[in-house]
Amino acid sequence: MARMSFVLAAYQMVLSLLMTSLTGSSLQSSECPQLCVCEIRPWFTPQSTYREATTVDCNDLRLTRIPSNLSSDTQVLLLQSNNIAKTVDELQQLFNLTELDFSQNNFTNIKEVGLANLTQLTTLHLEENQITEMNDYCLQDLSNLQELYINHNQISTISANAFSGLKNLLRLHLNSNKLKVIDSRWFDSTPNLEILMIGENPVIGILDMNFKPLSNLRSLVLAGMYLTDIPGNALVGLDSLESLSFYDNKLVKVPQLALQKVPNLKFLDLNKNPIHKIQEGDFKNMLRLKELGINNMGELVSVDRYALDNLPELTKLEATNNPKLSYIHRLAFRSVPALESLMLNNNALNAVYQKTVESLPNLREISIHSNPLRCDCVIHWINSNKTNIRFMEPLSMFCAMPPEYRGQQVKEVLIQDSSEQCLPMISHDTFPNHLNMDIGTTVFLDCRAMAEPEPEIYWVTPLGNKITVETLSEKYKLSSEGTLEISKIQIEDSGRYTCVAQNVEGADTRVVMIKVNGTLLDGAQVLKIYVKQTESHSILVSWKVNSNVMTSNLKWSSATMKIDNPHITYTARVPVDVHEYNLTHLQPSTDYEVCLTVSNIHQQTQKSCVNVTTKNAAFALDISDQETSTALAAVMGSMFAVISLASIAVYIAKRFKRKNYHHSLKKYMQKTSSIPLNELYPPLINLWEGDSEKDKDGTADTKPTQVDTSRSYYMW
């Protein structure tokens, strides 16, 4: 019995397939327009429910009108990429039509599409046409429409009642048009809208209450609109919003007030905005936020203290490909217990503090590769056995500094270096090297530094005044983060401002030159070299740093001394803790230019030069030399008298005796003559060539040469 039931079921299945095949064949042969494809295809409703639909596919046929012999059973009509600009009544008999695709055609007006009486239509594609406006009630017959794609057109005007009748609309794509305003009245007719994409429109700005009628909206995309600011009440009414994108705008700060009005937000995209810093309160009390993206921000330099605060459900933070992001405060995260993934790769970070990582109890993975990492005490935690955090792409983690470790893998270096304290280093790009401000404006200079122990930050003004957090001044104010505020700047405030970061190990500095209305009053020189003593064969030079801009324990990373005249040029590296230098083995009565160049760890350089002429050799003889010379002259005089008498006595001697006498006199005179100065004082380079071939040849290379002058300097 079971066998017969199985055979009967199989027979019925074959019969059903045969009938379907015959039906499809009949549809294709008798009711399918020429060149089109007519068949039953899978179809998904706007709610992603699977169905099968009778589909007529006439895409890419260069049609100028809709085929006339369409079956009334057609449910999906695809006419994409044709040249249709107008319909007559070809659609009026398609009572079962649920999806219509007119994308990439030549419509300029919605009325010309012929949408009357399409009461079953749920999805309409009109993207990439030439539509310029949407008039009142232009879609009122589409009472069941759930998806409207009208993006990538030329729409500049939408009337207040253009969407009237679309009470069931769930998805609206208006992006990439020419809209200059967003009118909240548009949305009065779409109370059930869940997804709105309106980016890439040249809107003048977002207004307060712009989206208030959209209480059911779940996703809002405001990308590529050149927005510079989001008003505090712009997002009021979006109580169901879960996903928000401000991608590729011109926001210079996080719209924290507006974000507080979307209590259920889960996904926030702020990527590709010129936000300068993420500061305290920017992301605070966003209780449902799960993922945050702050990638590709060309101006982002720092994530400050408590920038992310009380985000109990945040699980993923992406802050990658920010070319200036060089500083994350050790207390950047507060009450972020659920964070599992922290992506910080491809930035300008020199380090991430251990305390930052320890504040994230559920952190599972971190990505800090492709950063110019500073391999010293700040990142020793990376090699700690106490952490179970997985490092993404660890083989791409290389040291950028100190110089002796550059290019080596981080973990290999940290095994060798176990120091617990290290010098401060001011983060690169936190403020520019030069500014030109308008008179009366307020200036903010953000200085950030990393070190162990944590450095103190203060600023020094062009007049040498030290500005600290405790300083009381109407002109200057310093935040605990290191941001100097200069109120209502005037021309007399122009000049050199120096940030100093200092701890027990030493200090680091960075300078910004500020012009006001193009004027710079400050002429102070950071580094000054001067001649302390001049002799015929040596010069003693000294230098000092302007006390207005440097601290006494500032350490340079390198220093170079160069001496130059038209005949010789020599360069030597100077120990960085030296403030005096004795240049020896010089030529008398010769002009020289002596230059000192110093560089800090940021490769910022300061240079100072001085011109000097060595003394004449006659003034350089000491007393012992004079006594020796006098004695030598007396001996030579006596000998000369004896030789003169002998010459008269043997005048009549034989020629060979006269010859021998002449030879003896010549030999004696060679022993007693003065040595030329250019032999007594050979060029500086010869002093360190020792017994080399150059000594034998008696020649000097006049090309600039790197030499060791460790024997000729004096310690301060």
Curated annotation (Swiss-Prot):
Limits of the LRRNT domain: 26-72
Disulphide bridges: C447-C499
SMART domains with a match to the protein in the record: IG, IGc2, LRR_SD22, LRR_TYP, LRRCT
Residue ranges, annotated region (Disordered): 691-716
Keywords, comma-separated and alphabetical: Disulfide bond, Glycoprotein, Immunoglobulin domain, Leucine-rich repeat, Membrane, Repeat, Signal, Transmembrane, Transmembrane helix
Stored InterPro entries: Cys-rich_flank_reg_C, Dev_Immune_Receptor, FN3_dom, FN3_sf, Ig-like_dom, Ig-like_dom_sf, Ig-like_fold, Ig_I-set
Cytoplasmic side: 653-716
Residue ranges of domain Ig-like C2-type in the record: 424-515
Disulfide bond listed as a keyword: yes
Name listed for the protein in its UniProt record: Leucine-rich repeat neuronal protein 1
